[in-house]
């Protein structure tokens, strides 16, 4: 290559390198920012609008539908609690299409200490289960958008008969997907109020414990 063409080649090479650097360099902090926002978003997905505290010892209730929901895929159940005739009751209504509610009595002494401080979100109702991607999920059973629009906390979600891995609000007709808690049909708005859920062996090594909290 003669001197003239060598000069032109090096000049073009230098210009291309500068162009690539000027294009890519501004994207570096942007990509770092996106990564940071993503990790922060995961932490911020837990709702603290209403207090949630629920603990359930599965070993005292073999075959219970709460545990069945956590051991499946795309399986969920509505959970609520009440205190009647000096006994705590846990009610569980799975999305299995049978429309049956299990009544679980809490009578064991170790469980009663937890029952006294049950607080199941906005209006005594949560949804727990396991997603199709093996991710435990827990949501408030109230429609967050109707709470925002109308006030109060009496907007319970029910299973969508067309797809029981979804819930629907009778008031606003929004449909929420339980995989991620997002609105998949209806007006724009907030996703479901999500809570943390842990499911593991009890500290004393006897059986497993389900805990939902924020």
What is the meaning of each model-derived region?
Residues 170-214:
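Short Fe-S-cluster ligation motifs
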Residues 146-179:
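Conserved binding-pocket/active-site segment within a compact domain
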Residues 2-27:
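Bacterial N-terminal signal peptides that target proteins for export
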Residues 44-159, 195-214:
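N-terminal pre-ligand scaffold of iron-sulfur
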Residues 27-33:
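Short, basic, low-complexity termini and linkers enriched in Ser/Thr/Gly/Pro
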Residues 35-39:
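C-terminal motif of bacterial Sec signal peptides marking the signal peptidase cleavage site
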């Amino acid at each position: 290559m003669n001197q003239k063409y060598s000069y032109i080649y090096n000049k073009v090479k230098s210009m291309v390198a500068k162009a690539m650097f000027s294009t890519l360099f501004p994207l570096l902090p942007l990509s770092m920012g996106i990564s940071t926002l993503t990790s922060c978003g995961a932490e911020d997905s837990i709702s603290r609008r209403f207090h949630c505290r629920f603990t359930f010892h599965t070993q005292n209730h073999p075959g219970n539908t709460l545990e069945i929901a956590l051991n499946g895929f795309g399986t969920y159940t509505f959970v609520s609690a009440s205190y009647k005739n000096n006994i705590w009751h846990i009610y569980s209504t799975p999305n299995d299409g049978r429309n049956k509610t299990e009544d679980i009595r809490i009578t064991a002494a170790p469980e009663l200490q937890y029952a006294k401080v049950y607080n199941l979100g906005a209006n005594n109702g949560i949804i727990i289960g396991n997603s199709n991607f093996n991710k435990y999920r827990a949501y408030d059973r109230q429609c967050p958008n109707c709470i925002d629009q109308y006030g109060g906390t009496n907007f319970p979600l029910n299973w969508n008969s067309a797809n029981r891995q979804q819930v629907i609000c009778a008031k606003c007709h929004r449909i929420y997907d339980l995989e991620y808690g997002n609105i998949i049909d209806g007006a724009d708005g907030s996703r479901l109020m999500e809570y943390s859920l842990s499911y593991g062996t009890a500290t004393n090594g006897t059986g497993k414990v389900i805990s939902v909290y924020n």
